[in-house]
Amino acid sequence: MSEPTGVIHDIGYQRYIGPRLGRRHVFGALYLHGLRTVFGLGRTAKAKIFPWLVVGIVTLVAAGITAVRSQIGEVVMTYAQFADSMSWLVIFFVAVAAPELVSRDLRSGVLPLYFSRPLPRDDYPLAKLLALVSAIWLLLGGPQLVMFLGAAFITDKGMRGVWDELLDLLPGLLYAGLWAAVFASIGLLVASLTGKRAFAAGGIVAVFLMTTPIVGTLSILPSRTINELAFLASPSTLVGGVGTWALGDLLVPEGRGGGVPIGGFGPVYGVAAVLLVAACVALLLLRYRKVAAR
């Protein structure tokens, strides 16, 4: 029996001898890449047009509100009201950003490459979700900071006035976080169902806009209870209901009217918002566990 005659050739490859980063670094890299993707950073100029157009619009609106306030000396729009008024724009922002985060990977078939590394199955969707939440929060919170800085410069109450403005800003930022959590969880779940970005974008817009007529129909029924609970039927009005309940005068200044007429069902809206986000996140994780098992 002849001996083996095979030869191993050294063609110059060198083993990696550096530090092997763990799960936290992998998650951080996915999160940072997702955040950059949302705003088109590191991508073509075409990918930057829409996200930065939206950023420009909301910043311009905030600057305009600040300028008007400096002239008339009165609050034109509270920080929480600003988040409400920009929600329609956030819908389209999510419809473009969410498919970029997940639909492209589904269509190109690169998920097996992600999961071939020591990456827990839940980390991929959670990193993408956190990136989208952060992007929406920055989109709504950044202009609020512009409004705050303008108000701080024009106040005639010194540091006391600046402190009062800060106390108004913080609930506004928390409210922006609620918008971000609800919109991102729904948008990413819908986008994860298809690898085609156009279908994903259309589905996201449909979920937010087609639920609005349901609210309108329920709100004109002859039952006051149904009228006050009608706003649970749409994500946008659900968040508005939570804001009306939790923020009160910070969202609807006394004497100006407005807000969502939820009656005494504020806690119901709060619980519904938490359950909605939790359900969307659970379904998103389940979706990627199925994808990883293929």
Predicted regions, residues:
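Secretory targeting signals
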Residues: 126-127, 131-188, 192
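Hydrophobic alpha-helical transmembrane segments of multi-pass membrane proteins
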Residues: 82, 86-89, 98, 133, ...
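Alpha-helical transmembrane segments of multipass membrane proteins
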Residues: 57-61, 135, 139, 143, ...
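Membrane-embedded or membrane-proximal helical elements that form or frame transporter/channel pores
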Residues: 63-98, 102-104, 250-272
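Hydrophobic alpha-helical transmembrane segments of multi-pass membrane transport/permease proteins
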Residues: 45-67, 88-94, 204-211, 275-279
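Terminal transmembrane helical anchor/hairpin motif
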Residues: 198-292
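Helix-loop-helix units of permease transmembrane domains in multi-pass membrane transporters
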Residues: 101-134
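Aromatic- and glycine-rich beta-strand/loop motifs that create alpha-glucan
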Residues: 2-49, 286
